[in-house]
Curated annotation (Swiss-Prot):
Identification of the protein by name: UPF0229 protein Tbd_1233
Xref: InterPro entries: UPF0229 (IPR006698), vWFA_dom_sf (IPR036465)
Annotated family: Belongs to the UPF0229 family.
Compositionally biased intervals (Gly residues): 93-104
NCBIfam families: PRK05325.1-2 (NF003707), PRK05325.1-3 (NF003708)
Domain of life, per lineage: Bacteria
Species for this entry: Thiobacillus denitrificans (strain ATCC 25259 / T1)
Transmembrane segments: none
Region (Disordered): 85-108
Pfam families: DUF444
Matching SUPFAM superfamilies: vWA-like
């Protein structure tokens, strides 16, 4: 019976299995820490690790032990200090008196460990997905395309590769005839030597002639091409991603959006952008900033540049509509949008925003999410968008009143739907 001994060095990941088991066990605590990360630090720093603190009581294993009551008259082995009848004080806990100890000084210190960037992001984006990430016409039959995958010895005659087959035949003939050809050469040289010596009529010469004839017959019997030589071009079905998506991010940077509100809006979109790049490889993200005039910008300018002015939200919606019609046909793209604003808008423009959504944008999109930031009272845009929400299931809206609301609102807007 054979035995395999794995002598490979585990390196720095020698405890990877135990670590994964530990992460699964304390999943609830880790998810709670991930939810607090948005309010505890900048969203731009989400792509790094995180320190997780777990209470010591959650680490303890259930055990059987003697209760605090009852009487025990026993002297344990190794005792040198006590005799029967002595009363022993309960030992103090291990909690330290420093800043990291337990509050009462009698418990155990919390256990703190570091999550890697990948582990933290996995927990952070758990249970999140773009809603309805599928096209109805593509759901039933996945799209595939043929791609080359070398050559095979069996296949459709229409896929016969002549050049590859002839190469195989030449190689086979050379291999099969190599031995007889060498023997034929040696026999012919021996016969020539006998003839040169005048012994061409001797029995040895006749035997060589018979051997030469047999060897020539063997060489001639090697087929020019055989079924073993045939090679066919092989093609396999490669799945083609049937769902490609584009996400529009619309940000209000008008004068009514103060720096605190802009900061919350930027954090929301940065969180959204991290989610998209984490979860989907084939997705476009279009950044649109607007005040009185809308402008498509790159990621850096979207988050960093500062402008001010009035508020005309319809300019951003019109630009989004034009970009969809120009670059993202609905037959090939799933279209999603998220808009962040304080809700302050020119009163005459809010009804136009409602009409643009209902008539031009929502018919082209799968989902449109709107977040209103730090608006104490519903603004005109919010009231018009409530009418949009009542008219279309593709539209969702939430309010963010504080920095701590970003993550819960984000999860509510983009949570997975139960199957």
């Amino acid at each position: 019976m054979s035995q395999l001994v794995d002598r490979r060095l585990s390196g720095k990941n020698r405890s990877a299995v135990n670590r994964q088991r530990f992460l699964r066990r304390f999943k609830a605590q880790i998810r709670k820490a991930a939810a607090q990360a948005v309010s505890g630090r900048k969203v731009a720093d989400l792509e790094r690790g995180e320190k997780i603190s777990i209470p010591s009581k959650d680490l303890s294993e259930p055990i059987f032990h003697h209760g605090p009551g009852g009487r025990r008259n026993v002297i344990l082995p190794g005792n040198r200090e006590f005799v029967s009848g002595d009363r022993i004080d309960r030992p103090a806990g291990e909690g330290g008196g420093g800043s990291g100890g337990s509050p009462d000084g009698e418990g155990m210190d919390d256990f703190v460990f570091e999550l890697s960037k990948e582990e933290f992001m996995d927990y952070f984006f758990e249970d999140l997905a773009l809603p309805d990430m599928v096209k109805k016409q593509l759901a039933a039959v996945p799209e595939v395309k043929k791609s080359r995958a070398g050559f095979v010895s069996h296949g459709n005659p229409a896929n016969l590769h002549v050049v590859r087959s002839m190469k195989q035949a030449i190689g086979r003939r050379l291999a099969m005839a190599a031995g007889p050809r060498e023997a034929l050469r040696q026999a012919e040289e021996a016969l020539e030597a006998l003839v040169a010596e005048g012994r061409g009529a001797e029995p040895d010469a006749e035997a060589l002639r018979e051997e030469i004839a047999a060897l020539k017959a063997r060489v001639a019997a090697v087929p020019f091409i055989d079924t073993w030589d045939l090679r066919y071009a092989h093609r396999v079905d490669q799945p083609v991603p049937s769902s490609q998506a584009v996400m529009f991010c619309l940000l209000d940077v008008s004068g009514s959006m103060d720096e605190d509100r802009k900061n919350i809006a930027k954090r929301f979109f940065m969180l959204l952008y991290l989610f998209l790049t984490k979860s989907y490889e084939r997705i476009d993200v279009v950044f649109i900033r607007h005040h009185t005039v809308a402008k498509e910008v790159d990621e850096e300018e979207f988050f960093s540049s500062r402008e001010s002015g009035g508020t005309v939200v319809s300019s951003a919606l019109e630009l989004m509509r034009d970009i969809i019609l120009a670059r993202y046909p609905t037959s090939n793209w799933n279209i999603y949008a998220a808009q962040a604003s304080d809700g302050d808008n020119w009163d005459d423009d809010s009804p136009r925003c409602r009409d643009l959504l209902l008539q031009s944008i929502l018919p082209l999109t799968q989902y449109f999410a709107y977040v209103e930031i730090e608006a104490e009272e519903p603004q005109s845009l919010w009231r018009e968008y409530e009418r949009v929400k009542a008219a279309s299931p593709r539209f969702a809206m939430q309010r963010i009143l504080a920095l701590e609301d970003i993550y819960p609102v984000f999860r509510e807007l983009f949570r997975k739907k139960a199957a």
